[in-house]
Amino acid sequence: MTGKIKVHIDPKGYDEKPSGKEIGGIKSRLQKDTSPSLVTLEELVQKVETGHSISPGIMEGMSAKDWKEQQLFMVDIDNEEDGPILRIKDAKAICHDNGLSPAFYYQTFSHTKEHPKFRLAFVMDKPITDEGMRKYIMETLVNLFPQSDKSCVNADRIFHGTNKSAKLLNENGRISWEDIEAVSFPTQKNTVAAMLATQKCARIPN
């Protein structure tokens, strides 16, 4: 069954990477002035490849504390770390090895053949409404890819669209909380439950 997901989409598209005051305008339109859209993945990919920025987190304001829920999770692959360049085929192989099905990907405004920059999109099978779970999902996904931008984990993160290639891999592609739990790293010592408990405690005001 093909389902729709909720996401903030900037009504204005760009032919090149936004900068300066444009970025502030995008954030205001996305998270303050624009209600979330309910779209199919095909519709979302069409918006992304015509330069529309998106906010995967459903917000009731412009800061991370205003986050309410999220079903779409994005990973930035910027290839800025030392080590081998990670290309789309390599990222897809990592997903396959870990039982994760990315829904779509797209090359960013800054992408070149020599220096690939792209984003992978994952869709949960249901919206996430717990901030601790959101953070754990995001950190698990970014840590899975050696050339990902580890700073792109905040709840109010905005992702710009592109003027380059975007590809829908699986309209019905979804991942579950159990899929995320099954991803393991050699240096990961905390259990999921322990991490969530710690994150929830950290949110309790003094």
Task: Set out the residue ranges of the language-model regions.
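Short, well-ordered alpha-helical segments in soluble proteins
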Residues: I128, L141-F145, S165
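A common structural junction motif
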Residues: N98-P102, E139-D149
